[in-house]
Amino acid sequence: SVVPNKIYLGEKMTQGLGAGCDPEVGRKAAVESIEEIKSFLEGETRMVFITCGMGGGTGTGAAPVIAKEAKSRGLLTIGVITLPFTHEGIGNRRRATAGINEMQKHVDSLIVVDNNKIYDVFGTKNYFDALPQADEVLCTAVKGIADIINSSAHRNVDFADVYNRMRGSGIARIGMGR
């Protein structure tokens, strides 16, 4: 990954592997790495975006732990998550639902992207082509919020405005169209 600052969650526990579709392993991995997570949240941080795909183990289990820590520090905490494709199976959908319910407890706003819509919006037929397009939707959501704060075109909108609008706002959905 080209990301300059990253944390490998639960290195001892997972030995560099994923959570094997087990959210409890993902949760424990985040707890193992909580001191590193805390260090990322220190300083001038005022807003945190937590993005993940729900339904597997790492994102489903770790994201709520990270969100809880961020929110406990008074940071504006925004989750931007994807629901698994239907063909990924009922188990993934059930884990995703449980993960969303847990995530809601620890974020100010939760933006949910249903991966099934990717096929319709982008005209994609192939699962492997749809994955980067789902990532693009997540990035666009985060960038859109950040741009509102940072753009001079929105002179009357600053972090305080976004904070007040998004603090405790609950679930949001992204509409997609072309």
Where do the protein language model's features map onto the residues?
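Tubulin/FtsZ superfamily GTPase core signature
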Residues: S1-R178
